[in-house]
Structures are given as structure tokens and as C-alpha cells.
A protein has these predicted regions:
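Primarily recognizes the serine-hydrolase "nucleophile elbow" in alpha/beta-hydrolase
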Residues: 10-56
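Conserved Rossmann-like nucleotide-binding pocket used by diverse enzymes
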Residues: 39, 63, 91-93
């Protein structure tokens, strides 16, 4: 039994931007039972060839910038496809912005969180 379960603490929901999102994506791929879900803003696949994992229904929001000079939306789409292949429930959105965060990111993340968090924190 994991230490969180001993104390009745639910799995965390990761929220990351840029490299923080890459770290959260890496946790999903390396320790798939540790997170209840994730919001990944301006992310890219953290590994070239990750080992397959089971992400049965883990909700993940990926948000990309269409004009991002650092992380191309196609790269985030590859991560979205990979996570879906492993069973995650992925929503990938692209906004007409660069690498910076926008109000659209915040609004979407808040809306997604409000819909997903109650179910994710009941595990």
C-alpha cells in the first residue's frame, strides 16, 4: 500500500508549464499510478521511446501554442497520441499564441479542472 493511501490522501493532479509539464508527463510515463490526472501546458514528449504503461482513463489536458517557437504543436500532438495509446483520456487543444501562457489557457485549465477534479480526487 502506498503511503498516501495509509493517510487517506488522494493521488495528486499535476499542473505543469513548459519543462514543468514535461516533468509531469515523465511521471505519467514512469510512475503511471502516482497521478490522478494532469494539465500539461506547452509540453513535449519527455522520452524518445518510453516503455508502454497502463494509463486506464487517466484524464490529461494538453494545451499548445500554434505559434510556439520552442515546442511545436505537432510535438505535443505526438505526446497526446502516445498517452491515448496507453489508455489516457486526453484532450489536446491548440491556441493561436506562442510559448507564453494566455488567458485562454487559464480559462480552459480552470474549466477542465472543475469538470475533472471531483472524479480524480475520489480515488
Amino acid at each position: 500500500m502506498c503511503p498516501r493511501a495509509l493517510w487517506g490522501i488522494a493521488s495528486p493532479i499535476a499542473l505543469g508549464y513548459s519543462n514543468g509539464a514535461n516533468i509531469a508527463a515523465a511521471v505519467l510515463l514512469l510512475r503511471p499510478t502516482e497521478l490522478a490526472g494532469a494539465i500539461l501546458l506547452r509540453t513535449t514528449p519527455p522520452f524518445a521511446h518510453p516503455n508502454p504503461v497502463k494509463l486506464d482513463g487517466v484524464p490529461v489536458l494538453i494545451v499548445s501554442g500554434a505559434r510556439d517557437p520552442i515546442i511545436q504543436p505537432e510535438s505535443a500532438a505526438k505526446l497526446a497520441s502516445l498517452l491515448e495509446r496507453y489508455g489516457a483520456a486526453v484532450e489536446h487543444r491548440v491556441f493561436p499564441v506562442g510559448h507564453e501562457l494566455s488567458q485562454a489557457d487559464v480559462t480552459l485549465a480552470q474549466s477542465w479542472w472543475n469538470k475533472q477534479a471531483p472524479a480524480m480526487t475520489n480515488n
